[in-house]
């Protein structure tokens, strides 16, 4: 197959989103970027990572009861707040500091880190639960973000 090895991405929902984040941590030499929807970001998903920049996006509902936006303890393990993961990718990607915040479709806010080697972005879907979104479209948002990044 004719695969562009500079444009390999990982995506997933729930534990699949967590898997994408683990891939970003330990296989940043392979992936150009990752994105998770309602990701289950169990600690230590962002520890012991390769010291390489990688694009990161999360789409997450603020009322998610399975993998809460602000984190929780589930089955005796800590699920990280989305903001913790965002900050870890800001550091990893050498972001200049500060964020841009703007609407992202109906009842959603896009938060993008400034001045990064690779993009770092979260779409907060206000009042939404553990869900795959169609407004904003999770698939369209992930592709629009990831397709801007290559190795």
Q: Residue ranges of each PLM-predicted region?
A:
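A conserved short beta-strand
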Residues: 29-39, 54-55
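Short, flexible/disordered intra-domain loops and linkers
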Residues: 69-80
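Active-site loop->helix "elbow" adjoining a glycine-rich segment at hydrolase catalytic centers
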Residues: 14-19, 39
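C-terminal catalytic histidine-bearing segment of alpha/beta-hydrolase fold enzymes
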Residues: 55-59, 80, 90-151
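Active-site nucleophile loop of the alpha/beta-hydrolase fold
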Residues: 35-43, 61-64
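Acidic catalytic loop of the alpha/beta-hydrolase fold
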Residues: 64-67, 130-132
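Gly/Ser-rich "nucleophile elbow"/oxyanion-hole loop immediately N-terminal to the catalytic nucleophile
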Residues: 1-15, 25-30
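Extracellular/periplasmic catalytic domains that process cell-envelope and extracellular macromolecules
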Residues: 2-3, 26-29, 48-52, 113-119
